[in-house]
Amino acid sequence: MTELKAKGXRAPHVAGSPSSPKVXSPLPCRQAAXPFPGSQTSDTLPEVSALPISLDGLLFPRICQGQDPPDEKTQDQQSLSDVEGAYSRVEATRGAGGSSSRPPEKDSGLLDSVLDTLWAPSGPGQSQPSPPACEVTSSWCLFGPELPEDPPGTSATQRVLSRLMSRSGGKAGDSSGMAAAHKVLPRGLSPSRQLLLPTTGSPHWSGAPVKPSPQSAALEVEEEDGSESEDSAGPLLKGKPRALGGAAAGGGAAAVPPGAXAGGIALVPKEDSCFSAPRVALVEQDAPMAPGRSPLATTVTDFIHVPILPLSHALLAARTRQLLEDESYDGGAGAASAFAPPRSSPSASSTPVPGGDFPDCAYAPDAEPKDDAYPVYGDFQPPALKIKEEEEGAEASARSPRSYLVAGASPAAFPDFPLGPPPPLPPRAPPSRPGEAAVTAAPASASVSSASSSGSTLECILYKAEGAPPQQGPFAPPPCKAPGAGGCLLPRDSLPSTSASAAATAAGAAPALYPALGLNGLPQLGYQAAVLKEGLPQVYPPYLNYLRPDSEASQSPQYSFESLPQKICLICGDEASGCHYGVLTCGSCKVFFKRAMEGQHNYLCAGRNDCIVDKIRRKNCPACRLRKCCQAGMVLGGRKFKKFNKVRVMRALDAVALPQPVGIPNENQALSQRFTFSPNQDIQLIPPLINLLLSIEPDVIYAGHDHTKPDTSSSLLTSLNQLGERQLLSVVKWSKSLPGFRNLHIDDQITLIQYSWMSLMVFGLGWRSYKHVSGQMLYFAPDLILNEQRMKESSFYSLCLTMWQIPQEFVKLQVSQEEFLCMKVLLLLNTIPLEGLRSQTQFEEMRSSYIRELIKAIGLRQKGVVPSSQRFYQLTKLLDNLHDLVKQLHLYCLNTFIQSRALSVEFPEMMSEVIAAQLPKILAGMVKPLLFHKK
């Protein structure tokens, strides 16, 4: 035995592993024949007896000729030294003086090369078969240290594999052991020429033992700058794995000292600390084995990945076992694709990949793959590679196949077998998580709006499925293209839902009476029944007339600001024959109104004065029909048009006011132009847009207050909240019929309603109190009227006094209905976010148009420039004062909402969403009020 000293050891030892000054290692004789020819150098090594290579009689059963067989005990120990010490790497640097010896480094190159040689088929670009072990010309030149004795009763092969299994994956003092396992393979090497070492991110074979930290040694990284041989197969890759070149890759290269052979590659890596510290070998019964598999196969498959071989026994056994043990896999599909080529193959064929570059669909990841980056079974892709997800189409599916899940399947339950061109993606099964709805397959790049999450219910009602196609525009929703999805999907930017009932609905509630509404894959939102009349609960009987079905809603005329109204009767929806008695009506409604007014009939409604008046049912209830005619503004003395003449209508509109942009109230010249009247015009024509506002005005809404019980603070507040919820639905429905409002972006529509709903409610309260009780009481609803005595008895008397100011102002100013309607629309448009709206231009045009309509409404009663300008100032000043008044209501409402449990006050769902999301924003000054006058 001869001592071999390494000069200038660079790599540090493992902590706790002592460095012996001398390590004896058996050195076999140096052979001058192939497969490692080299030039003679001055550095000669002492010749010692060659050692037999035996892997427990598995690989090479015979020993070299001319050698005496050692005794059994010596041979067993030497076999351990040979197998584990083979390919030992000695760190040597060229230095002048001083030498220190250390234990040479161990490597798993022999086992990798032997298994590669044993399993890889011969062919172009493949590894060459290893020469016979008994030939002198191609014998293995091995040297390595002596290993500590192992526990008796364990075979040499099992002890070696147990040690290889129990190694750590990193070097001493190096925290990047895991990262080393994911290094990129060098270009020019096919996957079949490399053994794929498992990492923590790689999957395990079914039935194989899973260790707590399965870290295996990765390919050694060469970090030297320029120490490479001229005849080497390839340059050293800086910071990349070193490839075995030349004959070393084919027949298993032997580690040769530096300078011994000119044609070979002297591997001078860092020290591998996986063999520096003593270890305890695993006994056979310690390692769990899969049933029907030998201990060797179980241990080897747990240690390495099987290379890409189409007919390898290990691959066939693994695939067969996988299909037998995987319960969730379908038998028919498994029989068809059980032995399909692995995913790492660039094509779906089973032809071995020749040596060369990797396909362009594979690239090196920037970071380590996640633990769930690969499926549990059937993935032979190298851990350092991942497939590009940007490829699309059938060609990309064939190159980078992915398993498509069926309904109710889990992503981890299927092996990743290659498939052909994918079929159309089926709709996803109904999920089990709350808040998630069944949707059809959509592109992953679909953007989701980041607006407030409280507008979900409003959005559901604003964009419900209608019979008529929606108005096309820059923000119009595209039509549905999912006939088999079971629901109407609107693929547009939408808001997430926060309601609890929506989660229950998505989790498996009974189907609604109309197609399920899911916006951009979001769950079905609350208050679905409020969209259609048929699904409305019984608690809303007075509101049934207003919530018409979609078939009736689609008959409503669509108006624009600069265009004339359509030929549709504003009373029954039939085709209009002209403007009769100041309103665009049909001939039937004209005759009915004339006879009813001239005959002075007292009609009584058999219902609740909320009957539906349309083309079919207009003769059912004359009382409701006459009431609707009066609400639309029909007057016996009004001007009549025998025919629907556009020219005469335009002349009548020009006589009322000129369509010029609105200006500041003190601009007398502009106001004089707008309020120019014909001297002989006795009766003014109501503008068509104001007539439309009259026709879309909501009907009476009841609070449902129980008068049989004494009034308490909680009962009154709960009744007011229920009334507010119904009025909020009424505001949404009214805004949808408002000309110009649907031209705004859906997010802007939701924002405007959320900011102005309280102003609209208190403004409507003031109008009802002014019209019905002359401002003496608060007329919340026909069944909830508070006089001054009931106000004092309530707990919100100060709040009632604040709201009472509005009807008193109406009484003082004697506001007309036309003025009220225009002011109501301006209240909807009087608060915007600080950053503005998405469709700010359309919003400003809409607001300017309704300001002009307010001026027209003022001109119907005021004659002259000065009275008209004064009237305009008074009405707009009232609108500005409403900001401060409504702010007090917001503060009280938010405090009551926070203390609702303690006060036993119930808040409905939609109102709760709006209060929780928008009131803190409004009270914090994060909105911009639009004022007519400076404070």
Swiss-Prot record:
Identification of the protein by name: Progesterone receptor
Region feature (AF2): 689-935
Biased composition (Low complexity): 17-28, 232-246, 335-356, 434-452
Domain observations: Composed of three domains: a modulating N-terminal domain, a DNA-binding domain and a C-terminal ligand-binding domain.
Gene this protein is translated from: PGR
Residue ranges of the motif LXXL motif 2: 115-119
ZnF NR C4-type span: 569-589, 605-629
PANTHER family for this protein: KNIRPS-RELATED PROTEIN-RELATED
Lineage: Eukaryota, Metazoa, Chordata, Craniata, Vertebrata
Recorded GO MF terms: nuclear steroid receptor activity; sequence-specific DNA binding; steroid binding; zinc ion binding
Classification via PROSITE patterns: NR_LBD (PS51843), NUCLEAR_REC_DBD_1 (PS00031), NUCLEAR_REC_DBD_2 (PS51030)
Protein species of origin: Ateles paniscus (Black spider monkey)
